[in-house]
Amino acid sequence: MKRKRAIIQHILSEKRRIEKIKEGDSMAGKDDFGTTKYIIYAEFEANGVVERPDVVGAIFGQTEGLLGDDLDLRELQKTGRIGRIKVEVHTKAGKSYGTILVPSSLDRVETAIIAAALETIDRVGPCEAKIRVVKIEDVRASKRKYIIERAKEILETLIEEEIPETQELVEEVRKAVREMELIEYGPEKLPAGPHVPFSDSIIVVEGRADVLNLLRHGIKNAIAVEGTSIPETIIKLSKERIVTAFTDGDRGGELILKELLQVADIDYVARAPEGKEVEELTKKEIIKALRSKVPAEEVYNELFNKGKSFYEIVKEREGKVKEEKPEKEVQQPKPQVKANEKIVKPLPVPKQDYRGFEEFVERVKNSQDPIALLLDENKNVIAEVHTRDLLSAIDENDGVYAVIFNGIITQRLIDVVSEKGVRYLIGAKKANVVRRPVTLKVITFAE
């Protein structure tokens, strides 16, 4: 009876041992060098005939509890930190030889500890054995080498193909977003940029495509006339804002420009290069055209009275700039004044300028947003507000001595500030000013 019990216990223990070996082998199949950082290469020699399961079982069995729970091989395999252990066995003259490969995603120190632990194994199955670590390979170095070689091959195949640069891709996305910013303005639902409702200056173009092109290049204060008949919204805006007419460089653009100059209060005129349309201009061409804008009064006079084209006017202006070179000052002899002769100097004509407010004028000019400054008599800033909130700010603050803002001085604004006792009103431009109180000095930046 005792013998039977001993045989059964032996069979059960052997069964458990085989199951452990199988479990270790199946766990080893979870990782196939996918996230491996290092590979431990080892060689073994056993004084007898052994098989692969014997070697795997020895590795798991004899290192169990040796390095603590954190570096236990079974736990490391369950969490994927140790990969599938590969073993090759060869038998010769009653002895077994082979190699062991252990993939590791641990760090260098922990991998070295695991490698050293393998060398403590002294038995494989029933036989004495010896394991020696040959090397630890850094898989990432091999991957880097592969990446370099493969990248060279890919580059050779793509070298002749046009690959968009990152900047081009970014610009494409920006353009798509800007196109979504298009709004409809006024009763006529004119295509316009998002800044048209509150911007002090606007650009009037011919059609929707022109507004879209300007939007793509970051210009958000454009509005289209949409046809040869100028809408009432454009006429009304021209009386309240600083308006630049920006038309195509063809016959149609010239006709629309003439109509705009006749029915609207245009301040500046810009044209696309001859033969080109605004909708097809590049950013560089748009900026160059807008920088070369000509005052509307000059264009009106030359266009209607002298019959010159816009481009002739621009060429003449450029020619005048080249001719106006600084000449050397010729020293003229000073007139001799007799002892009894009186020197009569002309009395200076008083100019209405913004002396004493230069610092504040530059401040509003250089601001990214249109702002207004409210000053007291000692030139201290009482309030700094957006130009659209100027009227309410004047109404809410007492003791305002001067108002300086980057916007258009209108009759309504003059009436409001004069009622509050303001002495100085300084702005970018005047528009339709009919009456001006004696106590109020109205000054533009140009003055």
From Swiss-Prot:
Which keywords does the record carry?
Answer: DNA replication, DNA-directed RNA polymerase, Exosome, Magnesium, Metal-binding, Nucleotidyltransferase, Primosome, Transcription, Transferase
Entry annotated with the keyword Metal-binding: yes
Residues annotated as binding Mg(2+) 1: 206, 248
EC category: transferase
As recorded in UniProt, its EC number(s) are: 2.7.7.101
Which cofactors does the annotated protein need, by name? Mg(2+)
Report the co-factor binding details: Binds two Mg(2+) per subunit.
Q: Name one GO biological process term.
A: DNA replication, synthesis of primer
Question: Which residues hold Mg(2+) 2?
Answer: 248, 250
Keyword Repeat attached: no
Q: Which domain of life is it from?
A: Archaea
The UniProt entry, under Pfam families, shows: Toprim_4 (PF13662)
The residues covered by the Toprim domain are 200-274
GO CC field: cytoplasm; DNA-directed RNA polymerase complex; exosome (RNase complex); primosome complex
Which SUPFAM superfamilies does its entry note? DNA primase core (SSF56731)
Give the record's subunit note: Forms a ternary complex with MCM helicase and DNA. Component of the archaeal exosome complex.
* Family matches, as PANTHER family: DNA PRIMASE
Q: What does this protein do?
A: RNA polymerase that catalyzes the synthesis of short RNA molecules used as primers for DNA polymerase during DNA replication. Also part of the exosome, which is a complex involved in RNA degradation. Acts as a poly(A)-binding protein that enhances the interaction between heteromeric, adenine-rich transcripts and the exosome.
Record-stated family: Belongs to the archaeal DnaG primase family.
Protein's UniProt name: DNA primase DnaG
Natural source organism: Pyrococcus abyssi (strain GE5 / Orsay)
Provide the organism lineage as a comma list. Answer: Archaea, Methanobacteriati, Methanobacteriota, Thermococci, Thermococcales
